[in-house]
Amino acid sequence: MTLHPDLQKALFVEDAEQLTPEQLAAAMNGPAGEGLSGTLGSRIGIRFVWVSKEKVVAQMPVEGNRQPTGRLHGGASLALAEELASVGSFMNVDPARQAAVGVDLSATHVRGASAGLVTGEATLAYRGRSIMVWTVEIKDEQGRLTSLARCTCNVISIGA
């Protein structure tokens, strides 16, 4: 298993600890600002805003991610939630030896969004040696909660 090149560049940048959460987010978005290129997240338009060990924030357009009724598809909300939790988990591991993978994801969709951007904010709820749990709030442009999710990531060994 190898890390995604954009993620690897962001995590292995010299003096990464000195970067602000906004600078880390920009690094995660890649040189073209398109998110982690070639991933589901980039295909559905996820753009990082804030990346730290305790919190990850990103935005995603409703346009292109709708269900047949014209509202944001619940699967797109879940993809946003897992993307945020996974990136946050990567911030808490040794990227030369470990990776984080989502193993459990659940959400309650409380309101539909039909236009604009939604913003997801993942907050680290528990960090252990082999597991991390994140709570994710997804809100519409008016700041109203649309989905509340919880994502659990396992920490696995990579490399030799």
For the regions a language model picked out, list residue spans one by one.
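Terminal targeting signals and extreme-terminal segments of soluble enzymes
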Residues: 1-160
